[in-house]
């Protein structure tokens, strides 16, 4: 069975790392490519688990050596995917999941147009701001300038949603995990004829509902909230002025995600 290459992208704080972790608990045969980065480890992150950490000089030597399938600079740090991850997954007959930003995803799609691409959106700027603030608190400091910068960057990244085949809105974790699982199983069914047994019809329906081409009505409130759908065609950011007390009441189970 030929493995499938899945790309998953999302603004920082959208919860994609949690989604990927939950998916791998429930679906076998999905390898995860541990990205390389030059940013400093956060909290309990360990080399080789969440990321492979390298100095900027080491990373640039790896670029020159052709180590990476894709790489990009995001928020002042390099991130990249080693080609070896894809070779190892193919040798094992496994699917491979790449957790990469929109720049890296564009590079991979250009080289491998058969890849399945998935974009994860936060439900609105207020929830995203809460997650980013809570992550900053967990690191010992709340940097409002950095939070606002990432909110602005999120709107820019969301503008790229049309480049992805599937769209998830991570408002309810269990539902988003079920949707991600359905996408993987449906793609296996369509591409490899892999059986999904009695769940087949429901799985295919859930996956189809997440297709970007079928998601416009569902996505409009999110796009409007992030200013991607301005009435005059201009980006209209609406991050709100909610207090910290209101922020603390938001769902924060994905606070530590990139």
Enumerate the language-model features and the residues they cover.
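Walker A/P-loop
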Residues: 17
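Post-Walker A helix-loop "phosphate-sensing" segment adjacent to the P-loop in P-loop NTPases
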Residues: 25-33
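P-loop (Walker A) phosphate-binding loop of NTP-binding proteins
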Residues: 9-11
């Amino acid at each position: 069975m030929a493995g499938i290459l899945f790309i998953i992208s999302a603004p920082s704080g959208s919860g994609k790392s949690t989604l990927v972790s939950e998916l791998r608990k429930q679906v076998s045969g999905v390898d995860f490519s541990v990205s390389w980065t030059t940013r400093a480890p956060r909290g309990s992150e360990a080399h080789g688990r969440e990321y492979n950490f390298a100095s900027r000089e080491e990373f640039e030597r790896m670029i020159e050596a052709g180590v990476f399938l894709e790489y990009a600079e995001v928020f002042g740090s390099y991130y990249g995917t080693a080609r070896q991850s894809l070779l190892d997954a193919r040798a094992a007959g496994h699917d491979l999941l790449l957790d990469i930003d929109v720049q890296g995803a564009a590079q991979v799609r250009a080289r491998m147009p058969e890849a399945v691409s998935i974009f994860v959106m936060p439900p609105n700027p207020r929830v995203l701001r809460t997650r980013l603030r809570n992550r900053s608190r967990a690191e010992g400091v709340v940097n409002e300038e950095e939070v606002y910068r990432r909110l602005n960057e999120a709107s820019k990244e969301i503008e790229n949603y049309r480049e992805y085949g599937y769209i998830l809105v991570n408002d309810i974790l269990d539902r988003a995990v079920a949707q991600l699982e359905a996408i993987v199983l449906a793609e296996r069914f369509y591409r490899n004829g892999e059986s999904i047994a009695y769940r087949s019809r429901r799985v295919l329906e859930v996956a189809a509902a997440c297709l970007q081409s079928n998601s416009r009505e569902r996505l409009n409130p999110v796009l409007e909230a992030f200013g991607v759908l301005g009435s005059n065609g201009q980006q209209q950011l609406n991050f709100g002025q909610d207090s910290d007390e209101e922020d603390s009441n938001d769902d924060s189970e994905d606070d530590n995600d990139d």
